[in-house]
Amino acid sequence: MQTGDFVNHAGMRANNTMTFYGQEKVAYNAQLCLMNMAVHGLTGRIKSGDEANTFYHDAHNLNGKCDYVMANPPFNVDKVKAESAEAADRLPFGMPAINKNKEVSNANYLWISYFYSYLNDHGRAGFVMPSSATDSSRKDKDIREALIKTGHVDVIISVANNFFYTKSLPCTLWFFDKRKSEELQDKVLFIDARNYYTVVDRTLNEWSDWQLKNLNAIVWLYRGETDEYRELISDYYTALESDDDFASIKDALEKKIQDKQKEAKEAVEAAKRKEKKVVQAKFDEEIAALDEKLTIAKEAIWLTEKFGEGIYADIPGLCKVADRKTILEEKGASLTPGAYVGVAPEEDDGVDFTERMKEIHQELLELQKESNELMNTISKNMEEMGL
């Protein structure tokens, strides 16, 4: 549904520009899918039943035919019949590990193989995997090595906890690209976004629209697509309704919010009792609008402090471009972003440690003195009371 919304938002009609295919073993789930698509004005070819079990059948004969593959498969599926899975083909890098019961006990690399296999010669894929899949061992590692050698692994992004309603564990986004430019064939972009997100509530995180744009911007610059980056910077200025530098805009917004909060407090105190809630609601709405702009300004600063006018750079703790030799020989074919980007340097808060410790020590001495004086006063009062 979101893919259709994305295409429609871009000015194209999803039903005219895309063909949606799906297969699902459980018929009820397939019916839900069709109903959901109909509600959103989309149509699709969805097959269901045993003949639509993805592990054992390519129900639409899509192997090698897809321009784009997007997927959020179930993680760590077990008890997949190895013989049936192998007979269904779509395994360009071979079978994952098979247990004594002749089953695949973890199907993550079956999914990865399928997504790659479905692509045509210029296809692209993007999908979600558990974080463990980026450096799992044994046969998984063999498949991963073969995959890396193709030069089609494009971007790997680590995602924080709580991005799914049903799973709290961190995950990883994988992107394949069979039409990578010649200069990028030997490279993979790693992004560690585990510390970059917006908290929705105690159990759910997400990327805001501007955060998604910022992550896209990193990929654009990696690919040399600087026009898209400049357009995003222009969008920031438009949203902020100012031509000042982003830091100045941020400072001005913070000042406006402080002033508005002070004004709200005074207005509520001066309002009649029955009008207080109405007055407060009016100011809350105005402050929320300013807060939204402040958030946008902070995201603009986050991006431009790292990439300036639009030149890609490896940022410790955030992003790193690595070549295949480094990945295969130095990192043991690991695709874990954290193994490449490292740790972000701690920000200098401008406080001299020695001087601050002296200040704290002096504060403690003064507090101790006040405490002693208070105890003496209490003791004296108790004596006067004959206690």
Residue ranges and their predicted role:
Residues 1-71, 76-87, 94, 98, ...:
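Conserved S-adenosyl-L-methionine
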Residues 30, 100-176:
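Conserved Class I SAM-dependent methyltransferase catalytic core
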Residues 65-66, 88, 106-107, 122-128, ...:
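Active-site lining segments that contact anionic ligands and/or coordinate catalytic metals
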Residues 80-106, 131-139, 160-166, 202-210, ...:
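Short, contiguous acidic/charged loop-to-helix segments that flank catalytic cores in large enzymes
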Residues 327-351, 355:
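Amphipathic alpha-helical/coiled-coil segments positioned at domain termini
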Residues 353, 357-378:
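Amphipathic alpha-helical coiled-coil segments
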